[in-house]
Swiss-Prot record:
GO cellular component terms listed in the entry, alphabetical order: endoplasmic reticulum membrane; ERMES complex
InterPro entries in the cross-refs: Mdm12, MMM1_dom, SMP_LBD
Principal place of residence: mitochondrion
Domain remark text: The SMP-LTD domain is a barrel-like domain that can bind various types of glycerophospholipids in its interior and mediate their transfer between two adjacent bilayers.
Pfam families: MMM1 (PF10296)
GO biological process: mitochondrial genome maintenance; mitochondrion-endoplasmic reticulum membrane tethering; phospholipid transport; protein insertion into mitochondrial outer membrane
Chain residue ranges for the region called Disordered: 233-305
The entry's keywords: Endoplasmic reticulum, Lipid transport, Lipid-binding, Membrane, Mitochondrion, Mitochondrion outer membrane, Transport
Function per UniProt: Component of the ERMES/MDM complex, which serves as a molecular tether to connect the endoplasmic reticulum (ER) and mitochondria. Components of this complex are involved in the control of mitochondrial shape and protein biogenesis, and function in nonvesicular lipid trafficking between the ER and mitochondria. MDM12 is required for the interaction of the ER-resident membrane protein MMM1 and the outer mitochondrial membrane-resident beta-barrel protein MDM10.
Oligomeric form and interacting partners: Component of the ER-mitochondria encounter structure (ERMES) or MDM complex, composed of MMM1, MDM10, MDM12 and MDM34. A MMM1 homodimer associates with one molecule of MDM12 on each side in a pairwise head-to-tail manner, and the SMP-LTD domains of MMM1 and MDM12 generate a continuous hydrophobic tunnel for phospholipid trafficking.
Biased composition (Acidic residues): 235-248
UniProt protein name: Mitochondrial distribution and morphology protein 12
Record-linked PROSITE patterns: SMP (PS51847)
Organism this protein belongs to: Kluyveromyces lactis (strain ATCC 8585 / CBS 2359 / DSM 70799 / NBRC 1267 / NRRL Y-1140 / WM37) (Yeast)
């Protein structure tokens, strides 16, 4: 069963782009940068005009892990956790090959013949992001949990390649897929130097920096959104009488260290989900490339195309 998304409405909400930008910047601060890069930050995020293709595969009750998480966080009581009448979990196949883009800036540091011998401003643009995977969507207690399970075979993405700007022919080649790669195709355009100086000091396709960014973003997405981690979107209405909520905007916020925000990221450890994911995932999508034997999801109701 195909699912249509009102993409224009989503991308028209400026808080979405700003929220993702803030999330990426907050996570970039946690990474140790190599000696040749300083001041790396996201300057712009654009969802693009092309929505993902989403196919509903199965419908079921949410996993116990989601309820345990809400109980641990104090968001629900034990009595509320037993009431599952309005809760639902969807297993969907997500195929995205759109025009989403991420723009970054940084300082490229040349440490030869001496440390910080030269510092050049860098502008980067990440685009042509491709992903095809199975994803869990669980809605319970006014919160939406999103977790990616495994990649799905796709001839257009099988090379798992990194593309660079055509004017710079540096090609980084293939990379081995883990249980889930998520981002399986990326194009990066890089510029060095002050463009407004008019001195032609523009270099393109800096392989080292591009490879670092590809690894960084792939690892970031896997760490934050691939099972046993998930994205938690909280749609609980804010209490206007709560002084702690005063002044908070409805923008997406990606700092999981602050309670009450709209987006939280849960990074889990390798744990089992119960019996059945290998069989159920292979049943609904025989084209799945690989999935960790330790990750298992119960699925009872199948919605085939």
């Amino acid at each position: 069963m195909s699912v249509e998304i009102d993409w224009d409405n989503i991308r028209g909400d400026l808080s979405v782009n700003q929220g993702v930008k803030d999330f990426l910047n907050s996570r970039l601060q946690e990474f140790e940068l190599p000696s040749y890069v300083n001041n790396l930050k996201v300057t712009n995020f654009d969802l693009g005009t092309m929505p993902p293709n989403v196919i509903l595969k199965q419908m079921d009750d949410p996993l116990d892990e989601f309820y345990s998480y809400l109980l641990q966080e104090g968001d629900i009581s034990k009595e509320a956790a037993k009431d599952k009448n309005t809760d639902v979990q969807l297993l969907v196949e997500l195929d995205y090959k759109g025009d989403m883009s991420i723009e970054l800036s940084a300082d490229l540091v040349l440490n030869y013949p001496s440390p910080q011998f030269m510092i050049l401003p860098v502008k980067l643009r990440i685009s042509d992001i491709g992903m095809h995977c199975l994803c869990l969507l669980a809605y319970l207690k006014k919160q939406l949990f999103i977790s990616f399970l495994c990649d799905v075979s796709d001839p257009l993405l099988e090379n798992d390649k990194l593309q660079v700007d055509p004017s710079g022919p540096n090609f980084m080649g293939k990379r081995a897929l883990e249980r889930i790669s998520l981002i399986r195709n990326i194009k990066i355009h890089t510029e060095l130097g002050q463009l407004d100086q008019g001195e032609g000091s523009v270099l393109r396709s800096v392989g080292k920096l591009e490879e670092f960014l590809v690894d960084l973003f792939r690892n970031l997405i896997r760490k934050e959104a691939a099972w046993p981690s998930w994205i938690d979107l909280d749609f609980t209405p804010e209490d206007p009488e709560d002084p702690e909520e005063e002044g908070r905007e409805n923008d997406l916020v990606a700092d999981s260290s602050n309670d009450g925000k709209d987006i939280e990221m849960k990074s889990g450890t390798e744990e089992t989900l119960g019996a059945g994911i290998q069989e159920s995932v292979q049943h609904v999508s025989p084209a799945v490339t690989s999935i960790d034997q330790e990750s298992r999801v119960n699925s009872n109701t199948s919605l085939e195309e």
